[in-house]
Amino acid sequence: MARMHTRRRGSSGSDRPTADEPPEWSDVDEDAIEERVVELAEQGHDPSQIGLKLRDEGVQGTPVPDVKLATGKKVTEILEAHDAEPELPEDFRNLLEKAVRLHEHVEANGQDHQNKRALQNTQSKIRRLADYYRGDKLDEEFAYSYETAREIIEE
């Protein structure tokens, strides 16, 4: 499948091994994993960072290779169940942060045409994602602009 804003195709990579149950060496209790997920979310970590921390550091010293295999729920589902989910979806927030950084860079460096184009592409992705999340995770009246993005990021 081609990429969104280029004519090139994506690079292929290896797939995650298919597994129906967690490995024997990772025998952590589901409740302990959920507690650790909520604890990390309260510390301000994003769902992807929580997954990385559980993979690297683990719970009680035992790594958790896959939260969904161990608990039957995704990290975001655990956060929703404990009312600890972030206000905005992680992918949307990351795009807003990128757009704010690019906008400030383009303001300071007006001749940087490559990053002007990158800003346009990022804004296009934000508008597409806003259409997807509008009504569910975003307000119905949400419209992207640099000012609204900066306000959201500064919160």
From Swiss-Prot:
Domain of life where this protein originates: Archaea
Gene3D superfamilies attached to this UniProt entry: 4.10.860.130, S15/NS1, RNA-binding (1.10.287.10)
Compositionally biased intervals (Basic and acidic residues): 34-45
Keyword set includes Nucleotide-binding: no
Signal sequence region: none
InterPro entries assigned: Ribosomal_uS15 (IPR000589), Ribosomal_uS15_arc_euk (IPR023029), Ribosomal_uS15_N (IPR012606), uS15_NS1_RNA-bd_sf (IPR009068)
Gene Ontology molecular function: small ribosomal subunit rRNA binding; structural constituent of ribosome
Gene Ontology cellular component list: cytosolic small ribosomal subunit
Region: Disordered, residue numbers: 1-66
Biased composition (Basic residues): 1-10
Single GO BP term: translation
Record keywords, A-Z: Ribonucleoprotein, Ribosomal protein
Biased composition range(s): Acidic residues: 21-33
PANTHER family for this protein: RIBOSOMAL PROTEIN S15P/S13E, SMALL RIBOSOMAL SUBUNIT PROTEIN US15
Homology family: Belongs to the universal ribosomal protein uS15 family.
Subunit comment: Part of the 30S ribosomal subunit.
Name of protein: Small ribosomal subunit protein uS15
Naturally occurring in which organism (per UniProt): Halobacterium salinarum (strain ATCC 700922 / JCM 11081 / NRC-1) (Halobacterium halobium)
Gene that this polypeptide is encoded by: rps15
